[in-house]
Regions:
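N-terminal cap/lid segment of alpha/beta-hydrolase-fold proteins
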Residues: 30-68
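C-terminal catalytic histidine-bearing segment of alpha/beta-hydrolase fold enzymes
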Residues: 276-340
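Serine-hydrolase catalytic core
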Residues: 217-298
């Protein structure tokens, strides 16, 4: 009986891990046509509306605004995996108390939004561009103080939009434990015989260790694990070279998806540091440094409290909320990147 419960727990964990993961070529020819509209806020400062994306499909957005006319700083959330909305905890309420507007959205093919699910490819990246265009035109918004917070796989969407649309008026990107590219990360994990990667592909293969032929046929987020063209459209470690704003990585010692591995973190932040020309930092480590696998013990990583476990539910944890709140306040109000 104990063995059955243990196996059930392991496969539930694998299913949650799959949700996290499921958590550059030339720009498509698109013409932004976002129109401003009168926004009706509830007594609690919340508004629900839809705006056209760059391809004309409507995308649903949620806005929470402090009382008053502003202007206020704005934080746009980008969900990971197949999530519909990024903010799934008390963080927006805590940000509201600090005088910060939050904007949340469902990408095309998700929730109330029109279109087909693009799994954080160019179409979803265009959704974020449309939202930034819309938000930056609102009267209660500080035009030079719009930030992005991405969760997990949302880093792929956020970095893609920032790289492909460098003129977006974004003050900073905060990335909580995003993968460099799910396909590439899994390939690397398999090559290094990392437990999380082996368990994930077995789960995707109905609980069995896949043969070479089966492995080549496994799909994740609509694409083969080995489809280079597919993952090139969803590769934060490539997009990071061209991001057009300061970049802050938030990383716990135990990653919510990739265990103790930090290869994905290193791939993104080192690329941004060496190629983008932007201010970069991971946690409270010194800014603009190059990270090494051999020196991981020398860097500062966050830790969960004793009653918290790394995983999909980490997005709801008080530890993550509190740490993200502190970094959001720092980036909006202290603006450490301006002292570079």
């Amino acid at each position: 009986m104990v063995k059955v419960i243990h196996n059930l727990s392991r496969y539930v964990s694998l299913f949650l891990l799959l949700l996290i993961f499921t958590a550059c070529t030339s720009n498509p020819k698109v013409t932004p046509t976002v129109e401003q509209q009168e926004i009706q806020f509830s007594s609690g400062g919340t508004a629900f509306l839809s705006i056209p994306s760059l391809n004309g499909n409507k995308i649903a957005i949620h806005i929470k605004k402090p009382a008053g006319d502003g202007p206020f700083p704005v934080l746009i959330g980008v969900a990971g995996g197949d999530g519909m909305y990024a903010f799934q905890s008390a963080l927006p309420i805590r940000l509201l108390e600090k005088g910060i507007v939050t904007v949340d959205f469902a990408s095309q093919g998700r929730g109330e939004s029109e279109g087909d699910d693009n799994h954080h490819g160019f179409v979803h990246q265009d959704d974020l561009k449309a939202i930034v265009d819309f938000v930056s035109g609102l009267s209660f918004v500080q035009k030079d103080n719009i930030g992005i917070l991405s969760y997990s796989y949302g880093a792929v969407l956020a970095t893609g939009a920032l790289a492909r649309y460098p003129d977006m008026p974004i003050a900073f990107l905060i990335d909580w434990e995003g993968p460099s590219s799910p396909g590439k990360d899994i390939q690397r994990g398999l090559e290094n015989d990392e437990a999380w990667a082996n368990e994930l592909v077995q789960f995707l293969n109905n609980g069995r260790e896949p043969t070479s032929e089966e492995l080549s046929q496994i799909l994740l987020h609509g694409g083969s694990l080995f489809d280079e063209a597919y993952w090139a459209e969803r590769d934060a470690s490539r997009f990071a070279a061209d991001i057009s704003c300061p970049y802050l990585r938030v990383q716990f010692d135990q990653d919510h998806a990739q265990g103790l591995s930090k290869s994905h973190m290193i791939a993104i932040i080192n690329t941004a540091t060496m190629s983008s020309g932007q201010w970069t930092r991971c946690n409270d480590n010194p800014p603009n440094i190059i990270y090494s696998e051999e020196e991981l013990s020398h860097y500062h990583f966050h830790h969960y409290s004793d009653n918290e476990i790394a995983g999909l539910s980490s997005i709801y944890s008080q530890s993550v909320d509190t740490i993200l709140l502190g970094y959001v306040e720092e980036m909006f109000f202290s603006r450490p990147y301006e002292s570079q």
